[in-house]
Amino acid sequence: MEFNLNADKEGWISEFLASRRTTRDFSKQPVSPELIDELLKDFLTAPSWSNTRPFKVAIATGERRDRLSAEFQKRWSVLSAALRGNLWKKIKLVLRWDGLPTSNWSISRPYVAELRPRSQRVGKELYEFIGIQRGDRKRRDEQWGKNYDFFGAPVEMFIYIHKSLHIFAANDAGLALENLIL
């Protein structure tokens, strides 16, 4: 999608923001370190609490990115097999925790009741669009596994926040990420 930015046109920012989309398949073309640096400059212009920018960025490209992806995919393979397995496989997974990387924040909470229908609708539309039936667990797992290949993106960025600042640092990182994405 190409966007013709005309800042002289009234409502251009709303039009630009409405053009946002999600990408699930990236080109393998490498991104130059100079372009990454330019994007990080924009990333760092976001406001933050006391202008402290309580986050760090780790960037993986090339062989390092591929090693991380391979490790994440290996863990996803173990986790998805255990989730489809019997109770013993699930207990073994919890005891060994050969699953996905951990986080300071729980990301597996269920949506609140009023948001759940929208979440389910969007998920259903995505899987219908890419031709995966609800009952096709194998293809659904394969599609989910693409998260751990970063959807083929040649650059992966990991954002780390200062845990002592709790949600405040996460908010600040979110603002910076919006700059990066835009």
Task: Identify the meaning behind each predicted range.
Residues M1-L182:
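Acidic, surface-exposed loops and disordered segments
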